[in-house]
Structure formats: structure tokens, C-alpha cells
Amino acid sequence: MMAKSVYKTVIFGAGQIGQMTARLLSSPCQLLCFADNDPHKHGSYIGNIPVCSPDAAAALLPDLVILGVLDEERRNSMIKQMENLGYHGPFRDPSVLRMFDARVAVMRLL
């Protein structure tokens, strides 16, 4: 079986980690949206990428969901939430961003 040429991707979490992940994302990922549990963010845009509810994101039938948080407990909760919404594809976490965690902490202080 051949690998997909483009992966329809959702980043779950529209905060700083999710946004940083989006900036580092490259092909073969097509970023469909940010999913977020904060209803005040729904309908807004980060750059040209829409922010929607997790159920709206699951309805887009993504091939991949990147979890835009570093906290393991929150990631596990997000995985369960997406699975309950019918998404059963792969999840990735932004573990590569752990090296930037100190920068994120400094950014929060600014």
C-alpha cells in the first residue's frame, strides 16, 4: 500500500503550543483547522486557519490529529474526546516542542 501524498490534519488545541506546531508543520500535511474546547474561539481564525469545535473538526474526517498540548493528562482527555466523536485515526503529540518549553514559559510571562 502506498503512503498518502497529503494528510488532512487537525491540530487539537488553539493555544501557544498548537500555534507553534502549526508554524512548524510542513507537507505532506494539509492543516484543515484548529479544534478547541473553548466556544469563544469557535468561528475565529489563526492566520487563515479556522478554529472550530472538536465535533466539527471530527466531521471533516481528518487523516491525522496533532495534540497541541504538552500535558499528558490533557492529551489523554483529548484522545478520548476525539474517539468518542468517531475519529479513530492516528494521534501525534508535539513532543519535539518540549525543547521549546522554556521559551513558551518565558512567552507566557511577557
Residue ranges, per PLM feature:
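Glycine-rich adenosine-cofactor-binding loop
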Residues: S5-L25
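Short, solvent-exposed amphipathic alpha-helical segments in soluble enzyme
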Residues: L24-Q30, M82-N84
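Secondary-structure boundary/capping residues
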Residues: Q30-L31, G43
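A short, basic/flexible loop-to-alpha-helix module at the beginning of a structural domain
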Residues: M1-M2
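Phosphate-bearing ligand-interacting subdomains
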Residues: P39-L110
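A general structural motif
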Residues: V6-Y7, L31, L61-P62
